[in-house]
Amino acid sequence: RDDIAQRRAMLLVDEVGGHERILAQFALCPGEDPTYHHIEDGAWPEDVPYATIHRLASAGHVGGIGRLCVQWCLQQGLPVRADTHADNTYMQHTLKACGFVRCGTIYTEDGTPRWAYYHYAI
């Protein structure tokens, strides 16, 4: 709900048989993310304003939808950071395919480790 209230929730939809269907949802959050202040086993390549991709989820109707969402984020004019679990190979593949580089490990508020990725502004 916070993503909606702050106008950062995004939906990717299409139309089939005259009805819209949700293909994916994600949040693009501009500004500093406190979770990213400390990074281990690496470093962020630059210290500039950025946006973060959070909560990317596909409905599973169409292949490659995660990549389309990430590519849209990259077109918004800011460097982009993202993170994912070590076992989320789908997201790791999507980020790498879109040109992200792994920069190290960050930890969520509850201490969960996440692989951290970065893409320069395009």
Question: In which residue ranges do the predicted regions lie?
Answer:
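Active-site rim helix/loop that mediates acceptor-substrate recognition in acyltransferases
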Residues: 1-10, 17
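Short hydrophobic/aromatic beta-strand element in the GNAT-like acyltransferase core
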Residues: 8-13, 25, 55, 114-116
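Conserved acetyl-CoA-binding loop-helix of GNAT-fold acetyltransferases
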Residues: 58-75, 92-97
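Glycine-rich acetyl-CoA-binding "A-motif" of GNAT/NAT acetyltransferases
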Residues: 19-24, 90
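Conserved acyl-donor/pantetheine-binding loop and adjacent beta-alpha core of acyl/acetyltransferases
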Residues: 27-61
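Conserved active-site alpha-helix within GNAT-family acetyltransferase domains
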Residues: 67, 86-105, 112
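C-terminal "cap" of GNAT-fold acetyltransferases
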Residues: 45-46, 108-122
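Conserved GNAT acetyl-CoA-binding A-motif
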Residues: 52, 75-87
